[in-house]
Amino acid sequence: MENHTIIIGYGVKGRSAAKALLDAGYNPNTIVVVSPDRESCDLATRDGLVAFVGDGRQEEVLRDVSIERAGQIIVATNEDDTSVLVTLTARRLAPADAKIIAAVRESQNADVMRQSGATSVIPTAESAGRLMGLSVISSAAGALMEDLLDSSRGLEVTERAVTKDELSMSPGDLNEKGLIILAIIRGGITHRFYTESIRFLEQGDRMVVIKYNRDED
């Protein structure tokens, strides 16, 4: 197995992450779940994923799921201290360019998680609280964010390569054609739409865009 995705923890966060990957077209055979809970692993197997019963903090367990060849690791345990230990071990064993995406319950632990080697850190409790607050301030804005978070319907945030027909066009040209561009990725650097630092699209550029999932119809 190579360039696969390892999900450590298969509670609500882990299952939601797996669903997002499957909705995006990932092959379920390339998603490996690691959990010390056999029932969670049985559930992952029923979902069509590869499952391994074990403690993600242990080096031998991560080696058993070929972490040295993984493309990305999702750390979705229920406790921040456990997630830090998992992330430390994963970062040491995984390829240098492997992404490690970790969830934290408390936002004050985000810096520790990054120092442990996480590429991206998601503060779950704070994010949920912000969404609830936004829904109170504006029910329409809250509904829109909820829509974006549900990859199976409506609007969806996705990343894709610039097509041949889009080369030499400006982001503004594509916006006029109805494409909503959030960012351009060039040379590994993300340029957000409001910086206006990208004048024309080039070969190798990637775009983060909002698209409409027509499966809703």
Whereabouts are the PLM-identified features?
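Cytosolic regulatory regions of ion transport systems
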Residues: 1-217
